[in-house]
Amino acid sequence: MAQQSPYSAAMAEQRHQEWLRFVDLLKNAYQNDLHLPLLNLMLTPDEREALGTRVRIVEELLRGEMSQRELKNELGAGIATITRGSNSLKAAPVELRQWLEEVLLKDH
């Protein structure tokens, strides 16, 4: 098995640090009630739509009333996107999953 080159590891670390910087920026934007303008600046309309679809995928997977194929037809998302969402949800920490259930399913 080939090892990752130090350059690749360094690039991965840089990307991770950039992600954490964005998360900190978003946290600060929430504290200053600037989160919507920031997200509108940083995300294209397609990216915002994709995030909304992913929230719906997670919500419906948590609800457990539809098959992945039904979700695909209902949401117009690709089956691979739904499968990734399902796998990510299975791998998510228990605390996150419980929180998502409370937040996303509270009115349903």
From Swiss-Prot:
InterPro entries: Trp_repress, Trp_repress_bac, Trp_repressor/repl_initiator, TrpR-like_sf. Keywords: Cytoplasm, DNA-binding, Repressor, Transcription, Transcription regulation. Its main location: cytoplasm. GO terms for biological process: negative regulation of DNA-templated transcription. It is found in: Cytoplasm. It comes from the Bacteria. Pfam families: Trp_repressor (PF01371). GO terms for cellular component: cytoplasm. Residues 68-91 bind DNA. GO terms for molecular function: DNA-binding transcription factor activity; sequence-specific DNA binding. Homodimer. Belongs to the TrpR family. HAMAP family: Trp_repressor. NCBIfam families: TrpR (TIGR01321). This protein is an aporepressor. When complexed with L-tryptophan it binds the operator region of the trp operon (5'-ACTAGT-'3') and prevents the initiation of transcription. The complex also regulates trp repressor biosynthesis by binding to its regulatory region. This is Trp operon repressor. The lineage of its organism: Bacteria, Pseudomonadati, Pseudomonadota, Gammaproteobacteria, Enterobacterales.
